[in-house]
């Protein structure tokens, strides 16, 4: 199944999609346009959710397998958030362990790859890709409170 078979629901200020369980991401295959690359267990969210500020993907790598190539970026750094499994991550000539709870940031120039070192469990992660050096604010500076009592009653349900 390709990720084009996924659908999102939208409202005035949001989009939502259900990808299913991380352990079932292997049913999706990403095929890179203009390149002979097929990646099983990878779903990009930019088109699905109409993202405007980042590319995000969710990923699943079967036991005892490796991503079959190294890659870099021209402009974007990547943040990897590991949510299940155990593996190893390689940046340039440095290899380090990753597991649930590990977070990795890689500069655009970093040559990267990873592998699943488990005999039984999938390695699952989320990747956030955004322009390096573009975020100068502190996390809370852009947000502001809304003077409204929280209520879950009488709301539209999707």
List each language-model region with its residue ranges.
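Double-stranded beta-helix
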Residues: 113-158
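Conserved short histidine dyad/triad with adjacent acidic residue
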Residues: 38-44, 57-73
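Short beta-strand His + acidic residue motifs that chelate non-heme Fe in jelly-roll/DSBH
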Residues: 69, 89-90, 106, 112-119, ...
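Glycine- and acidic-residue-biased ligand/ion/polar-headgroup-sensing regions
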Residues: 75-77, 81-87, 92
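A generic "binding-loop/recognition-motif" signal
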Residues: 75, 94, 110-111, 131
């Amino acid at each position: 199944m390709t990720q084009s078979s996924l659908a999102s629901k939208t409202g005035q200020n949001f989009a939502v999609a259900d990808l299913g369980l991380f352990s079932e991401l292997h049913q999706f295959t990403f095929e890179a346009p203009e390149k002979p690359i097929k990646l099983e267990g990878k779903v990009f969210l930019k088109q699905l959710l109409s993202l405007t500020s980042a590319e995000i993907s969710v990923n699943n790598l079967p036991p005892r397998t490796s991503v079959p190539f190294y890659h870099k970026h021209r402009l974007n750094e990547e943040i990897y958030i590991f949510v299940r499994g155990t593996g190893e991550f390689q940046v340039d000539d440095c290899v380090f362990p990753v597991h649930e709870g590990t977070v990795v940031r890689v500069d655009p120039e970093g040559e990267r790859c990873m592998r699943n070192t488990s005999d039984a469990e999938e390695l699952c992660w989320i990747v956030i890709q955004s322009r390096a050096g573009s975020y100068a604010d502190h996390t809370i500076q852009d947000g502001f409170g809304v003077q409204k009592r929280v209520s879950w009653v009488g709301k539209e349900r999707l």
